[in-house]
């Protein structure tokens, strides 16, 4: 008996540029498990090609956004997916851009799962325009968050039963042939992310204190 795999349209950021959300998108795109379990189709949501372009506007960006909208619309009509997975932004100008994409998907009758790699909804929810947009943005969708604590950011608009928690991860790298190097020298540790409280800098410093 031929079993049809569910068709999923993944609308997500992939490199370039390289950042957390785009790397997770690349891991999903390259995942044997994901691609063998579902009939997968992909649209790269990224408009910026360099890190310094993220969050900025301009005519070039506007044309890029319009092209992405057309790409998404074309993919939905062609694939006719059972589910659309999208990694949108939660606040600011990038949110307004993604709001248009999400509302277009809803008008096309799509079932939507949003995977958030950032937060900021709670900081904007008391603004009249943003509040109105969030109500329509989150209506009838499922959410994937990176941690339980992040639910506080969206709880005004999304029921807890519509939220799934999936921490970020990286592919397993075999180190079987790497001999551990023991030395009395002071170790050098690289903190490769933003120096922000929400990125875990305080927990990182606490961990270093324990290691000492």
Model-derived features with residue positions:
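Membrane-proximal helix-turn-helix segments that form the acceptor-binding/catalytic region
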Residues: 103-108, 126-142
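N-terminal subdomain of nucleotide-sugar transferases
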Residues: 1-48, 79, 109
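A short, basic/aromatic alpha-helical/loop segment that forms part
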Residues: 18, 92, 172-175, 196-201
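A short, charged, and often flexible helix/loop element on the N-terminal side
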Residues: 44-74, 90-97
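Conserved donor-binding/catalytic core segment of Leloir-type glycosyltransferases
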Residues: 9-11, 180-210
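Short N-terminal targeting/anchoring amphipathic segment
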Residues: 10, 72-97, 110-113, 117
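Donor nucleotide-sugar binding/catalytic pocket of nucleotide-sugar-dependent glycosyltransferases
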Residues: 135-177, 192
């Amino acid at each position: 008996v031929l079993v049809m795999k569910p068709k999923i349209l993944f609308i997500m950021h992939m490199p370039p540029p390289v950042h957390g959300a785009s790397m997770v998108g690349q891991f999903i795109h390259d995942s044997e498990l994901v691609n063998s379990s579902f009939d997968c189709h992909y649209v790269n949501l990224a408009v910026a090609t360099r890190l310094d372009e993220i969050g900025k506007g301009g005519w070039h960006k506007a044309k890029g956004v319009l092209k992405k909208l057309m790409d998404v619309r074309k993919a939905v009509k062609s694939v006719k997916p059972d589910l659309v997975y999208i990694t949108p932004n939660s606040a600011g100008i990038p949110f307004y851009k993604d709001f248009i994409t999400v509302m277009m998907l809803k008008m096309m009758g799509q079932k939507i799962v949003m995977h958030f790699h950032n937060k900021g909804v709670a900081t904007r929810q008391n603004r009249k325009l943003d509040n109105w947009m969030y109500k329509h943005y989150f209506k009838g969708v499922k959410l994937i968050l990176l941690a339980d604590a992040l639910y506080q950011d969206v709880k005004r608009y999304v029921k807890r039963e519509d939220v799934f928690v999936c921490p970020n991860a990286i592919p397993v790298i075999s180190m079987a042939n790497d001999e551990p190097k023991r030395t009395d020298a002071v170790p050098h540790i690289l903190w490769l992310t933003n120096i922000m409280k929400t990125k875990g800098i305080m927990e990182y410093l606490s961990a270093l204190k324990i290691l000492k």
